[in-house]
């Protein structure tokens, strides 16, 4: 999944400053490759009837537990993408584009059981296999959709950035 590209942040800042139309076009191209993966990941989210019984909304819940429940519609709408660069991690790497789940229940469904695998009481009943290469790069919906995409999204985002760089260099050399 991770791919190393250098100079992309400087390119995007320069495009935003000198060629804003090219920056918008690049963002649209990147989004076109991320949207199918996002749509496919939403399809892997189980309905309210398929999820474990303790996760559904309780009518008599009060306090902090009043807002902590699983709702399939909320989880599906929480899966989205962004094309803006992330903050650097402790090793200095950034994500130029990412697909993530905003909802807490969706994030738990995605990542539960990464360490324990199928040995815990909680994660085997969630259903869905953990897909991905490494322990930190596994999940049930987003990572499964990304794995089935077979790198088309990554290649498309890189191609969009490279074509934007070529267009930007051609426009600024005049």
Where are these regions (language model features)?
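Short, low-complexity, charged/polar segments at coil/turn and helix-coil boundaries
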Residues: 13-132, 163, 169-174
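Disorder-to-helix initiation segments
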Residues: 1-20, 135
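Short helix/strand-capping connector loops at secondary-structure junctions
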Residues: 130-149
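C-terminal or internal capping secondary-structure element at the end of a domain, subdomain, or sheet
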Residues: 144-174
